[in-house]
Amino acid sequence: MKHEETYTSTLHTHVHFFIYEPQVIIRVKAVLFVQHDLNENASNYDHFANFMCDKGYVVVVSDMVGHGHSLIDFEQGYFGKTDVLDHLMKDMHHLQKVMMARYTDTPYYYIGTGLGAQMIREYAARFGDYFQGMLLMGAVSGVRAYRYKNLCLNFFKLMKGERYHLNKLALRTRMK
């Protein structure tokens, strides 16, 4: 079941986000946050979110400031004149705390593409203790290799089970 909610961004505009919750909940497997790329919006992920929802996951897809339903006072892709990265990190953390209040004792994972992947990478550096794993689709550099690999491995364990083994080359990196 999909429903839309909003919260007030640290940039003083409303951020719209969509929550997809399973129809029948015995126990939610995890909460998945989707951070999309710059020229996308939350509705692009309806099919994926519904698929994961049917598998027992709660999926949260937000349109950060300057995207999709959150465009009210901003042009597409425009975030404002201030320290944008800091504001986006605070907004992401606020949304996670909102969901943590609803789904306690539930693992949290992030999935990101393009700019969304870059945001998650920064979020992991600041708030990595608040979630269990991430899947980044796009350029990944600048995060400590050990922390990055652990978060990715945790995501694969969630999807494939505890006994799943990755190919040794799957997470090979040039990061130092």
Model-derived regions: residue spans:
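Proline/glycine-enriched tight loop/beta-turn segments at coil->beta junctions
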Residues: 13, 23-31, 57
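Active-site glycine-rich loops that stabilize anionic/oxyanionic intermediates
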Residues: 37-40
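Conserved alpha/beta-hydrolase
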Residues: 44-75
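Alpha/beta-hydrolase active-site loop
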Residues: 80-100
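Glycine-rich nucleophile elbow surrounding the catalytic serine of serine-hydrolase chemistry
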Residues: 112-122
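Alpha/beta-hydrolase-fold enzymes
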Residues: 121-176
